Amino acid sequence: TDIAVLLFSGEEYQAELEWFHYFKEKHTPTLCVLSKADTLTDSDSIAAQLKEETKQEILVISSKSKEDIEKFKEELIRLVPDDYGEETITGALVEEGDLVLLVMPQDIQAPKGRLILPQVQTIRDLLDHKCLVMSCTTDKLEDTLAALARPPKLIITDSQVFRTVYDKKPQESLLTSFSVLFAEYKGDFAYYKESAAAISSLTEESKVLIAECCTHAPLKEDIGREKIPNMLRKRIGAGLTVDIVSGTDFPKDLSNYDLIIQCGACMFNKKYVMTRIERAKEQKVPMSNYGVAIAYLSGILDKISY
């Protein structure tokens, strides 16, 4: 949650106060509103009590009043952080006029007739940066590079073909992946990168949790359910335990796991992902993401851009 709105409607508000303290603990900006003021004979007294409890101003409104509704909107806008919405997917990697090449395998996981959400969002972000955007499938990478008058400033690839693209890219072109971009955009890249090193200490007795935000029906060669577990077991051993959760499912107790690998989280906002990361940090469990983990397993983590 980026901003919380707590509605108080009378003298009974202990449940709301519990939520208030929860949001305060999470450093979430909170607007406290005493609503239905037109039905309360002692709204000023209740507001004073709430102010004493919360140590912040209480907005007293009635939804029947247009002026009160406008006051509510103004207070809500006031709580929006100054830098809200300024972060972008490609960040400082590109400038206006840069040539960017997207490598997007159209395998069984790619939905027929459309692109997946991270690709769509990244293309829009690049267009907003006024970049020149080209795209190709993995098998057409060499043909595409040969057709260009100059090397791309940046190549963004699907993480599962990281090594293939790295081996074929021009030396001067920066390389990243959609998942790595979202690691920075939606999460804590520094922690993801640091945690990827935990892969080297895993054994066949270790437990890994893979967390994906999508709730789609898994397909053959699914990156989270098949490809990453297979890559890990190939390196560590067939005995490695890999648990998988999806959607909003995420264990409160993470202490049984030696590593968590989170997807790019294109479906969730940053605050939601950071809540997971904070939980992992509190329980001292390393947490990485799909792209960062694959880059580590491919031996190119120190050679990619983000």
PLM feature segments, named:
Residues 1-59, 88-92, 115-134, 138-147, ...:
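Conserved C-terminal guanine-recognition region of P-loop GTPase G domains, centered on the G4
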Residues 10, 36, 106-107, 214:
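Residue-level signal for short, function-critical loop segments
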Residues 12-13, 39-40, 65, 109-112, ...:
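Alpha-helix N-cap/loop-to-helix initiation residues
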Residues 28-31, 36-92, 99-101, 108, ...:
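Canonical P-loop GTPase G-domain recognition
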Residues 94-96, 202:
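Short flexible coil/turn linkers enriched for glycine and charged/polar residues
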Residues 100-106, 207-212:
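Short beta-strand segments enriched in small/hydrophobic residues
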